[in-house]
């Protein structure tokens, strides 16, 4: 498969680690580790999408590494922003306005990711937006550096950087025999960084499910899906990082079964614009960086694509609006749990978690509970 040589610098920092899941085997190998009653434990590792992946599963037989690589390639060829030949790169570079940019979407990747992106955009009230790329560039959150950004500049870019109206349209292949995109401004670009890796994790898990494997942990770039149980017939144990700028400290461990877990954070990427220090989380509804104290948002949902997108939306919404949004989705029957870690007094952090998740957290570094009256 084609690996991405250059990591996506605009990718929101992932604050997630897999506790006890990484095994020191060579890249791309399939290796058994001690057996359980359900079979051997197999581990595949490799590089893809500018990061690394680990697939760990319990089975009598190993699944070929090429099956995972083929799955990764299906997404990569469509949505890798660093691959000039990808469908995404070709569309973003297109200057055609109003005319259809047609492509096969033979694996249905675009149809799936577009549907999820539209849904989360709607559910979050616009906090999740896959057209935010030009605004990220404006603020210097990509490769470019920007010292000054004015409201006039923001308003100008927002005319062609919002996921609504006639700015951009997608026609899925199910209704057209082939998929098609069109944009009303040549500067409009799409950016699926906050959903594509989660979607890929779901697809890799499906590779195992299609072969009868039901106990697995699949991780790509910090996005994780856990199905069934581990080799000890226990839920998979996933560790969450402490949101610190340098070094690494594990904050907590969470047992996870039959759920996906994704974390978004902004604490390792900052820029100085207009004399102010901003994190690299931008609110697409205003076109400006967020200023609240939410440092990381960990979200659990059945599908990794949704957990990935939900976590990004929470980072935009902030601690209080994010809590209300999660509670609203739960009230509507969504299977979603969340953990937020916020700035506290001095060097301290505070946290908020949904009750079910909080009851399962194993704290490695204790935190005080978040008190909104002290910060907002």
Question: Which role does the model predict for each range below?
Answer:
Residues 2-16, 22-376:
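Mature catalytic core of soluble alpha/beta enzymes
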């Amino acid at each position: 498969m084609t690996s991405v040589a250059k990591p996506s610098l605009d990718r929101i920092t992932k604050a997630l680690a897999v506790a006890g899941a990484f095994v020191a085997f060579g890249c791309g190998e399939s290796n058994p580790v001690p057996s359980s009653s359900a079979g051997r434990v197999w581990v595949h590792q490799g590089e893809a999408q500018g990061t690394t992946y680990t697939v760990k599963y319990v089975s009598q037989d190993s699944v070929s590494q090429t099956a995972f690589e083929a799955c990764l390639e299906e997404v990569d060829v469509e949505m890798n922003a660093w691959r000039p030949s990808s469908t995404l790169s070709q569309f973003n570079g297109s200057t055609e306005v109003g005319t259809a940019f047609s492509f096969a979407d033979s694996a249905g990747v675009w149809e799936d990711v577009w549907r999820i992106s539209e849904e989360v955009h709607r559910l979050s009230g616009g906090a999740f937006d896959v057209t935010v790329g030009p605004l990220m560039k404006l603020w210097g959150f990509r490769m470019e550096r920007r010292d000054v950004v004015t409201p006039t500049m923001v308003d100008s870019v927002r005319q062609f950087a919002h996921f609504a109206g006639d700015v951009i349209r997608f026609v899925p292949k199910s209704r057209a025999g082939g998929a098609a995109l069109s944009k009303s401004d040549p500067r409009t670009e799409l950016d699926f960084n906050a959903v594509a890796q989660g979607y890929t994790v779901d697809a890799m898990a499906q590779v195992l499910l299609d072969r009868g494997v039901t106990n697995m942990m699949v991780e790509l770039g910090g996005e994780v899906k856990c199905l069934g149980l581990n080799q000890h017939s226990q839920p998979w144990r996933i560790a969450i990082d402490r949101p610190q700028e340098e070094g690494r400290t594990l904050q907590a461990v969470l047992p996870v079964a039959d759920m996906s877990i994704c974390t978004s954070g902004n604490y390792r990427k900052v820029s100085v614009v207009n004399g102010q220090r901003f994190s690299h989380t931008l609110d697409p509804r205003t076109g400006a960086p967020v200023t609240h104290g939410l440092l990381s948002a960990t979200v659990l949902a059945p599908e990794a694509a949704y957990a990935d997108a939900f976590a990004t939306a929470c980072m935009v919404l902030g601690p209080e609006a994010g809590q209300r949004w999660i509670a609203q989705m739960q009230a509507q029957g969504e299977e979603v749990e969340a953990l937020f870690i916020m700035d506290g007094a001095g060097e301290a952090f505070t946290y908020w978690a949904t009750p079910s998740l909080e009851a399962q957290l194993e704290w490695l570094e204790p935190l005080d509970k978040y008190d909104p009256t002290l910060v907002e």
